[in-house]
């Protein structure tokens, strides 16, 4: 009979058990949480689409586009989870973290960042527009997704820096820089909060022209 594992540990791979507060478990938990929030937001969008029937087709088109973009983001997070678990490279991204052929919402990783930093130019949304409850439920959930993606990135940095330090025999707490493992995953995660911000700005621009300083069409 196999020995019963302690309550404070959890199985993760064929390598055995780790504690539930291990960076690996924290990363996977943050990634799982972000996926769950995307699905919640998609459910809300389904309800919004039902309410939009018979109204201006522009509204329905905008909501459907956002629904599709969220599905692309969800699929990407699932690909990241699979890539981390299997050790396989992330599709479209070079192992050294360079962009490769990767696209999200039709944009490269660098374009996602550029659109986020220049939202007024691309979407007519004034720089540093702060989230507000008057922007609606969907926008609030997009902002929540943005913050959760930051948490995923933070957890990933700790995990992959620690893994690299262990592999190289370096002290993880030392000041000497350690090149992290899985730079492909880290590079993508570094751009995903920008991707969520792009969705936020586009959503406001399309459905709240009173906030946008310039017109933007689907």
Predicted regions and their residues:
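Phosphate/pyrophosphate-binding loop motifs in nucleotide- or prenyl diphosphate-using proteins
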Residues: 1-218
